[in-house]
């Protein structure tokens, strides 16, 4: 396992988790799931209402996982679903819980057709002291060849 790479992610429906797992397999990085204290509803329609309300008011939920120190890592992959063109609130909590100065940040996201939306801009805004590498956005299935090409330009 690479001691210098962290893959931190939040996943609602396991799509982002699968993306994070593949990044970990190909980089040897350490996985860290970002888990909010209060889980979202299992009902999709209810969950989307909860998420939209949180995003609109800029809410950052408390985390039960994701607040652990990141000092040992030089490169941090940050994964989020694209929710209403925004970063998932638990990922925003993760960003605000840490100092990313002088770290390399690599965003990745899953989406249902909206690409990155405002996720890269949000990460750049929240982590102004970091070096931001262009990320990768994928729909429901992971294109392993595309992922490998992207990672080749970052960690190999």
Predicted regions and their residues:
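Short glycine-rich anion-binding loops that position phosphate/pyrophosphate groups of nucleotides
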Residues: 81-84, 112
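Redox-cofactor binding/interface segments in oxidoreductases and associated redox assembly factors
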Residues: 78-79, 107
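A structural signal for short coil/turn segments at secondary-structure junctions
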Residues: 27, 98, 127-130
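N-terminal beta1-alpha1-beta2 submodule of the flavodoxin-like/Rossmannoid cofactor-binding fold
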Residues: 1-78, 85-87, 92, 96, ...
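Hydrophobic beta-strand segments of well-ordered beta-sheets in folded domains
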Residues: 5, 105-106
